Amino acid sequence: MLYPDYEGRSLYNLSQSIITSLGLPTRRPVIKEIPDDGKKLSVVLIDGFGYRAGIKAGVLAEGDPFITSVFPSITTTALITLMSGQMPGEHCVLGGTTFVKKLGVIIDNFSYMPVYTKGRDSLKEITPMKELYQVENTIERAEREGKKCAIISPDFIKNSELTTITNSSSGNHFSYYHLWDALYYYRKALEGDYDFVYLYIPFADKLSHFYGPYSEPNLEAIRSIVEAVKRVAVDHRSRFRTVITADHGHVEAGEAIQMGENANLRSTFTIPPFGSTRSIFFSGK
């Protein structure tokens, strides 16, 4: 089993490198391979772009160094860690769903609503997500210090409660519909007077879920995305150091365990399980 390496080789440590590149104070380990030499930092996060898939796609070689994700490694937890500089146990967004004692419900963190209801961001009427979790945000900290940040993300998550703590409500935001306009905005941001540029790309994760992580559609997507990002980034390497990374990878699943079919197990729960399929939390009697 592979554990997160929080001492210098994890997504958490990349968050510390971002903080350092913006001239903000941090007391926690950074990624040593990213020198603090005055270059600005550009981070491109490809959702679901795992190390093994990268090797099979031909964009990584066997033996290349890698960093780990965080635990839990689901997108919500990983992205918030990356953009807050907080460990999962500090920001407390521990999966796709979380039991929030203050509200007395299990909430869907992607849609910020109770899991058994409909209505995206409906809990905003009770308390904003940013206030519920009290997450720090590196973009907000940097902007207060006079830094300029560009955040490029898909249109379908624009103005959602989740993006207030993953992308921040500060900085300059650019929404895109497909990879091609994402790369356009990315190039424009690198050409602009920004101190930090962040691009989030979800496509590989979607294809991994539909076709499998090592399917040709997903491997071709990884190849195309990585090569396209590199073509843009190389023209700006004198000013920006570009890091292409991921929130997590994927593995091919074997047998699924349906815990709901075990009546004895169900009877021990005080509330339904929450978290995610890769990291389930139980509250038992």
Segments predicted by a language model, with ranges:
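Feature captures the catalytic ectodomains and active-site-proximal regions of enzymes
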Residues: M1-K285
